[in-house]
Amino acid sequence: MGQKINPIGLRLGINRTWDSRWFAGKAEYGKLLHEDVKIREILHKELKQAAVARIVIERPHKKCRVTIHSARPGVVIGKKGADIDKLRKRVADITSSDVVINIVEIRKPELDATLVAESIAQQLERRVAFRRAMKRAVQSAMRLGAEGIRINCSGRLGGAEIARMEWYREGRVPLHTLRADIDYGVATAFTTFGTCGVKVWIFKGEILEHDPMAQDKRMNEGGGESSQPRSRRDAA
């Protein structure tokens, strides 16, 4: 089962928590969920060059707090905060709540599965040899402290007539072990030969305590992300 299921979904409530953190009754649930989807679509579209790994949405009383986890916070903020103010206004057009945007810096993007997958996909689009891109990502992750990493690339690799799947693994990636801290990311490369899919699993160690927030705490303590987020509040 652990080989097939999304490893993040399998560990929700054990050592990882949801990226949408709010509660609503039946009357508002659908509306708020649709807002979350639109907010994420807009932010990913506007911040293509900002290396965004996660977007966490929280809804305290009459507010919408959006936390953007990015490896390039300067690109998100812009000159004198101009870009983040534009983003806040775009998000405010979707939701009726007061909007607060926080930026959390990812200090080691080589250990974030989503950013690794997107990096490989971008290299495939630039016609970099897929084996070289995969090996480089594996070496970088292991050098920075990952206990294991696996990368799958599938599609018409290298322009081959027949699509196939190639994979590399170094270290161990225990997908069945629920206490394992495994990050998972996917990306799609749009090449002239068609689309190529990239999947990345990164094993960062074990989390022994039963705490849904354990992974976030561990990243802040271990230097994976800065513990002091930068914020821009709604002027209203």
From Swiss-Prot:
Gene3D superfamilies the UniProt entry points to: 3.30.300.20, Ribosomal protein S3, C-terminal domain
SUPFAM superfamilies: Prokaryotic type KH domain (KH-domain type II) (SSF54814), Ribosomal protein S3 C-terminal domain (SSF54821)
PROSITE patterns the record matches: KH_TYPE_2 (PS50823), RIBOSOMAL_S3 (PS00548)
GO biological process: translation
Cystine pairs: none
Listed SMART domains: KH (SM00322)
NCBIfam families: rpsC_bact
Name of the protein in question: Small ribosomal subunit protein uS3
Organism: Bradyrhizobium sp. (strain BTAi1 / ATCC BAA-1182)
